[in-house]
Amino acid sequence: MQRELTRTATGTASTWASLKQEIIEAAPGLGIDSIGFASADPFLSLKAILEEHRARGYESGFEEPDIDKRIYPELYGSQPASLIAIAVAYPSKMKDPPKSDKGKYRGILARSAWGKDYHLVLREAMEKLEAFISERVPDAILKNMVDTGELSDRAVAERAGIGFSGKNTMMISPTLGSWIYLGELLTNIPFQPDEPVTDGCGECTKCLDACPTGALVGPGQLNAQRCVSFLTQTKGFLDEEFMLKIGNRLYGCDTCQIVCPKNRGLNWDHHPELTPDPEIVKPLLLPLLDLSNREFKDRFGQSAAAWRGKKPIQRNAVIGLGNFKDVSAVPKLTEVLLDDPRPELRGTAAWALSRIGGENAMTAIKQASEKEQHEQVREMIAQAHSKLEEQEQAEQQTSAELKAEDSQGPTTIYYDEMETPVGTLTLCATDRGLCRIDYGSFYAKEALLQQWARTWVGEYVYVQEPEKLREAAEQLREYFAGERREFSIAYDLRGTPFQEQVWRALQNIPYGQSVSYQDIAESIGRAKAVRAVGGANNKNPLPILFPCHRVSGANGSLVGYAGGLPVKMKLLELEKE
């Protein structure tokens, strides 16, 4: 599919070298933070990768469907003479971010949706660059693209020396990190190409380990169908697995960038138009459900988050309210469940109500089951009903303990973070002992930790106190160093009697060995409760210490793990050594 080379602009090699230097010097004044030049040769090595990506079902559906158009640069029917890649840096930190309070919980937009829509920002910068070039080269032919164009922005940027392609699939600049927007110009000016960046990720796998859904299936390999960023932008129903992982995200996901060491300490706030409005990028969830189309456009219209309309964001707000277990949201969620014309929101509201629980939630579910006609929504209502019944039983078992704790005032939950070979761990403990180990930072797990505390602790307050977690952290470091096989730490288990029975059974699995769910079920005298054992295993609050990574499928296959399968494999390999 090689195209005829476009008519080259009039000039000499010396002319283009001088112009290139002029462009580099002018770039900051045009709103460009990094600029590079590349050949316009076809991206032939990319073709096999894209074809395999498609064959495996990893595409999002947002890409250009014609792979050849993504491989062969095209300038109005001809092959351009060269490519110019640009990068605009954006903020990673928010000044005075509002916090979620009880009854006033907030969602979050990914940083790529902070401030003015980056498509507009990039186009404005590239149009200034086009004008700059055209003024000096009247017969220049120029065409700009952002991520809605045919070419792969990252492939162009990598060839042009903007940065290297990280294991999280992001373009990582040696100076700007991955907090950058990318765009490119195709031109008939034959600029001398820049050298690619030789830096890389090395042995680091923090992004792979931290990905909430395991969407990073390998270094530089993304299954978009599992990516939280993609999932938040879809318009249909979402599986419970994904709704739990979305947390309070309304649009996008930054986890793989937050944990990246190349981004440590980097924050770019020199583009005023990209400065986030805290009330827009971290909005209260409940009011989002009442937004009209006009109100949504007025509030979010300038953000990149608006491009899919209000339905995905409202659905995600419902998910967030469910994950926060916001009791104050039950009336509004009941209204959505019973009256909203959109089945996706009705079904999601049923799920959210089952997460929150309580008599009012059960009443709403029963009312909906009598009137709902949509088949998939009816299924979600039935599932919600079953979960609420299970919750009632669990609450009866734990109510006495919770009442005793409530009478003594809020329980302090101490937390701290530690870096390990499998990524960041957040440790939590009460005065009784260690109560949780979570994969990821406290920031990333805050919604999950709050909902857990509301369910199992009652009144609570989280306080960062490294000293309270010092002994647990030290024993974990010894484990990762291969110097410890057993732990001697005081625990504070919070779960149903059956769950606690399963969790304690996990402690009996020998170091370096694996057992099946069936083995665990038999060990506690519940041979027929294999599925229930699996459910309890999935809710294990103390992975590693209660080694659920040593549990395999019936045929010895790897099964899901809270930290993701790559982490599970690492732990098993560590114990083999």
Whereabouts are the PLM-identified features?
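Auxiliary alpha/beta "docking" domains used to position bulky ligands
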Residues: 1-200
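Iron-sulfur cluster-binding cysteine motifs and their immediate structural context
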Residues: 32, 206-229, 248-273
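C-terminal amphipathic alpha-helical segment
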Residues: 240-274, 286-287, 291, 295-319
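Amphipathic alpha-helical scaffolding segments comprising HEAT/armadillo-like alpha-solenoid repeats
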Residues: 295-299, 326-338, 358-370
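Alpha-helix N-cap/helix-start positions at coil->helix boundaries
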Residues: 307, 311-312, 327, 341-344, ...
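Structural detector for internal amphipathic alpha-helices that build alpha-solenoid repeat scaffolds
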Residues: 314-326, 346-358, 378-390
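Basic nucleic-acid-binding alpha-helical/helix-turn surface characteristic of O6-alkylguanine DNA
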Residues: 394-527, 574-577
